[in-house]
Amino acid sequence: MTGFTHERPGEGETNEWYTPKTFFTQLGEHITFDLDPCSPGVGLSHVPARRVFTKDDDGLTQQWEGLVFCNPPYGREVGLWAEKCAAHGNSMALVFARVDTAWFHKAVATADGVFFLAGRVKFHKGSIRNPNKGNASAGSCLILWGEAAMRIVENSDLLGVLMKPVAPAAAGE
């Protein structure tokens, strides 16, 4: 599968960056997702999900069900993952807040909300057992599709700003 890396690695570096456990503690310890379509694998992920797809499963081509948490690859294919989240509807995607990109605007136009996280996520680099953490190279946000995703963020302890997109037709009114 192409484009499954979260960052383009330098010489001798890993290209895998995992969402830290503290993120899910702040999101809500009682929250369990039905699917993580971008999982590094059982035992390597902090995503509380009943079902996972790894890069070998190619989550982008699989059928999604239930509430989805998607920390997609941050390469060129991020827009494809956002489109899959939008088509599914009951999902949240943790992505860089790349407001200068076409994929970001396309994704946000289909979303129910966007939660811009305060600060930068301190991802786990390579393995949750690896103590090395890496700050993201940009700010992150959660793009939210569906009422359940919105409600989770509204009731979370995450710090940031929740914004609701304005429909293009209503923008001029």
Where are these regions (language model features)?
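Class I S-adenosyl-L-methionine-dependent methyltransferase catalytic core
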Residues: 1-173
